[in-house]
Every structure is written in structure tokens, then in C-alpha cells.
């Protein structure tokens, strides 16, 4: 058995990636979220495949087909709710995974980090298009508002929006192409995940101390495979509780009303995992400025390795940077809350303050604090 595992061309790849992989001996539970993201992606692809068997991407039947899945398909309701809430679990793990990378300095693995940013954008695009498919009120108006942002691009904006829509408004052509992209993108995400892992295994994982541990590595299996299994149990338990007890907790009631282009919902908002970016978009009165701020709120992650001024890689022994990191987390939670509130005072001014603080913390305060810590340590 050992010979097959170590010599067979396919088994050898699996062996070097998940069994005999040399892993740092001190990585904490914050490193569990990579494997949990893999589990989430698998759940989403499997449940999505079963949903696609019964879904019809036509404006006249899309809403009814989702109702049909929940009512008439055997266990269709649980498949639909696992898929919907699985997306929330996916983003929850994704945000923690990125946060861990920021805290412990994993962004210094440039190739892995940049592929990770591409993965984030691809997953966000997939989730956005998936939210449009049930063709409820929030699906239709969310699609209209977000795709309409492309019209802010000078010269080509209007043509670009009509090209994306496939007409002069969000209609049948839009829904059909969104379904096609929503189906294919998870497989592109899976391919990017493989590239992400290839780059990661070129350098090896980071660890909480941020220093090289080449002299003290342990095999991934059984140590971290069992440790990951505990995370899997917690994730599946949380997802099961969410699906079985309050499946609509994170959804919007407006999406149980069929899409109607003649009636605008009182408050258009995306799913909770996009609210921080939506709040940044809304906090700028100018349309083009808002779109640029929205794009930068995600793409700013690509600048972080170049803004790293600290002599230490990890924040483990940098208390001032730790404080700023948790300020950033609190700020993102504030933005998430503001994104779900109506556009009126005091929410407008809170959103604008939080948006400024978000960019200020990452672009100026964190690099300056790192330089100050270097001075304190006489480095």
C-alpha cells in the first residue's frame, strides 16, 4: 500500500499534498479554514448540480421552478437551503481565512496571496449571479442596481451595461447568461484552488510566529487531518442548525415576492457578505467615485504586501499592530451593519466615517505603526 501511495503518478500527488506534506508543528486552529473552504466549495458544487437539474433560467418560470424544487422535488427544500446558507458559511470562512492571512503575515507569500485575491473576486461574482437566479424582487433589483454601476465607466459605460444585460433592461437574456456563468464559475474557482495550493506547497505554510520552521516540520496526516476534522464537524453542525431551524435567517423576505420591474422594494440591499462593500459604495455621493471605492475595497488586498513595513512578519509580537487589526475588524462589522440600513442620518455619516477609516487604517495607520514598532525594538 505504501509503495502505491508513494510511487503511483496520481497517488503521489495526493500523498505530497495531503498525507506526507511537511507542515509547521505550531499552526493553530486559524489554519483550519483553508480545508473548510474546500469543504464549502464541494458542498456548493454538489447541491448546485442537483438544483440545476430542476431549475429553469426563464423569467416566466424561474421563480416557480424554485418553488417547485422546495415543494415537489424529494428533499429539494433541504438542498436549496443548504446551497443558500452554504454560501453564507463559505464567506464566513473566507473572511476569517483572509483575516488570518493579514494577522500572521501570510501575504508575504505573494503568488499564493494574489491567487487568493483572484479566488475572492471569482467567488463574489459567483455568489452575486447566484442571488439573481431565484428571480424574486431583491434578485431583480439587486441585479439592476449592481450591473448599472458599470454605466459609471466613462465613454463605454452605457454600451457595456446594455451588453451585459443583453438588452435595454435586466430581462430573460440577463437571467440566462447569469445562470450559465453561475454554473461554470465554481469549476473555475476549483481550478484556481488547485493553483493556490500548488503555490502554497512551493513555499510551505506560514505559522503563528512568522519565522521559518524548516527544522521542525511534522506530517500533515494524521496530525492536521484530524485537527481539520474537528473544524469540519463544527462547520457541518452550524450549517445543519441554520438550515433546519432558521433557513431564512440570512435571506431577505422581499425575495419571496416574484420579480416585478414596476415595483421598487423600499430598500435594495445585497446579501450580508457584500454589505461592507455596498456601504463603501453608498458613502460616496459621486457615482464613479463610489464604483472606484467599491473596487478598491477589495483590490486594496493586493497592496498589503507592498505596504508591509514591519521587520517581523507576524503580528503575534506586535501589540500596537494587533490593536489596529481589531479596529479594522470592528470597522468592517460597522460597515456591514450600515450597508443594511436605509440611506438617512445618522447612518450616512457613520458609513462615510467608517469608509474613510477603512482605507486610512490599511494605507496609512498600519504601515506607520509598523515603522514605530521597529523603532521601539531598535531595528
From Swiss-Prot:
Keywords per UniProt: Electron transport, Heme, Iron, Membrane, Metal-binding, Mitochondrion, Mitochondrion inner membrane, Respiratory chain, Transmembrane, Transmembrane helix, Transport, Ubiquinone
UniProt cofactor note: Binds 2 heme b groups non-covalently.
Bilayer topology reads: Multi-pass membrane protein
Keyword Mitochondrion present in the record's keywords: the answer is: yes
According to its UniProt record, which cofactors does this protein need? heme b
UniProt source species: Nycticebus bengalensis (Bengal slow loris)
Q: Which domain of life is it from?
A: Eukaryota
Entry keyword annotation includes Membrane: yes
Q: What Gene3D superfamilies does the database record attribute to this sequence?
A: Cytochrome Bc1 Complex, Chain C
In the record, the note on similarity to other proteins reads: Belongs to the cytochrome b family.
Listed binding positions for heme b b566 are 97, 196
State its location(s).
Mitochondrion inner membrane
This protein's GO cellular component annotations are: mitochondrial inner membrane; respiratory chain complex III
Q: Summarize subunit and interaction data from the UniProt record for this chain.
A: The cytochrome bc1 complex contains 11 subunits: 3 respiratory subunits (MT-CYB, CYC1 and UQCRFS1), 2 core proteins (UQCRC1 and UQCRC2) and 6 low-molecular weight proteins (UQCRH/QCR6, UQCRB/QCR7, UQCRQ/QCR8, UQCR10/QCR9, UQCR11/QCR10 and a cleavage product of UQCRFS1). This cytochrome bc1 complex then forms a dimer.
Q: Mainly resides where?
A: mitochondrion
For binding a ubiquinone, which residues are annotated in this chain's numbering? 201
Role, per record: Component of the ubiquinol-cytochrome c reductase complex (complex III or cytochrome b-c1 complex) that is part of the mitochondrial respiratory chain. The b-c1 complex mediates electron transfer from ubiquinol to cytochrome c. Contributes to the generation of a proton gradient across the mitochondrial membrane that is then used for ATP synthesis.
- Protein name, please? Cytochrome b
The membrane spanning regions, by residue number, are 33-53, 77-98, 113-133, 178-198, 226-246, 288-308, 320-340, 347-367
- Single GO MF annotation: metal ion binding
Q: Which Pfam families match?
A: Cytochrom_B_C, Cytochrome_B
User: Which residues of this UniProt protein bind heme b b562?
Assistant: 83, 182
Tell me what else is known: Heme 1 (or BL or b562) is low-potential and absorbs at about 562 nm, and heme 2 (or BH or b566) is high-potential and absorbs at about 566 nm.
Q: Which InterPro entries does its entry note?
A: Cyt_b/b6_C (IPR005798), Cyt_b/b6_C_sf (IPR036150), Cyt_b/b6_N (IPR005797), Cytb/b6-like_sf (IPR027387), Cytochrome_b (IPR030689), Cytochrome_b_C_euk/bac (IPR048260), Cytochrome_b_N_euk/bac (IPR048259), Di-haem_cyt_TM (IPR016174)
A GO BP entry is: mitochondrial electron transport, ubiquinol to cytochrome c
Amino acid at each position: 500500500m505504501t509503495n502505491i501511495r508513494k510511487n503511483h503518478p496520481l497517488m503521489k500527488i495526493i500523498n505530497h499534498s495531503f498525507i506526507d506534506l511537511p507542515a509547521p508543528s505550531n499552526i493553530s486552529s486559524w489554519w483550519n479554514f483553508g480545508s473548510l473552504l474546500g469543504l464549502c466549495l464541494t458542498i456548493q458544487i454538489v447541491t448546485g448540480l442537483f438544483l440545476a437539474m430542476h431549475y429553469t433560467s426563464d423569467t416566466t418560470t424561474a421563480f416557480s421552478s424554485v418553488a417547485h424544487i422546495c415543494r415537489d422535488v424529494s428533499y429539494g427544500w433541504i438542498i436549496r437551503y443548504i446551497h443558500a446558507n452554504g454560501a453564507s458559511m463559505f464567506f464566513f470562512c473566507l473572511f476569517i481565512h483572509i483575516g488570518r492571512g493579514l494577522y500572521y503575515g501570510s501575504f508575504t507569500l505573494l503568488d499564493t496571496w494574489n491567487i487568493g485575491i483572484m479566488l475572492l473576486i471569482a467567488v463574489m461574482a459567483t455568489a452575486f449571479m447566484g442571488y439573481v437566479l431565484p428571480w424574486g424582487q431583491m434578485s431583480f433589483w439587486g441585479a439592476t442596481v449592481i450591473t448599472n454601476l458599470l454605466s459609471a465607466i466613462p465613454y463605454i459605460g452605457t454600451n457595456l451595461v446594455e451588453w451585459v444585460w443583453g438588452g435595454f433592461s435586466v430581462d430573460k437574456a440577463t437571467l440566462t447568461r447569469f445562470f450559465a456563468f453561475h454554473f461554470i464559475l465554481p469549476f473555475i474557482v476549483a481550478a484556481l484552488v488547485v493553483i493556490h495550493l500548488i503555490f502554497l506547497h512551493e513555499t510551505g505554510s506560514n505559522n503563528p510566529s512568522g519565522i521559518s520552521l524548516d527544522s521542525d516540520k511534522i506530517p500533515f496526516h494524521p496530525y492536521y487531518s484530524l485537527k481539520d476534522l474537528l473544524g469540519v464537524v463544527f462547520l457541518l453542525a452550524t450549517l445543519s442548525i441554520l438550515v433546519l431551524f432558521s433557513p431564512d435567517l440570512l435571506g431577505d423576505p422581499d425575495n419571496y415576492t416574484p420579480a416585478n420591474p414596476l415595483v421598487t422594494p423600499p430598500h435594495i440591499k445585497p446579501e450580508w457578505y457584500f454589505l461592507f462593500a455596498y456601504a463603501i459604495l453608498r458613502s460616496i455621493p459621486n457615482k464613479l467615485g463610489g464604483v472606484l471605492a467599491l473596487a478598491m475595497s477589495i483590490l486594496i488586498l493586493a497592496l498589503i504586501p507592498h505596504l508591509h513595513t514591519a521587520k517581523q512578519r507576524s503580528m503575534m509580537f506586535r501589540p500596537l499592530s494587533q490593536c489596529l487589526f481589531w479596529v479594522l475588524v470592528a470597522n468592517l462589522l460597522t460597515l456591514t451593519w450600515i450597508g443594511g440600513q436605509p440611506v438617512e442620518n445618522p447612518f450616512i455619516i457613520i458609513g462615510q466615517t467608517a469608509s474613510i477609516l477603512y482605507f486610512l487604517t490599511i494605507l496609512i495607520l498600519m504601515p506607520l505603526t509598523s515603522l514605530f514598532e521597529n523603532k521601539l525594538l531598535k531595528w
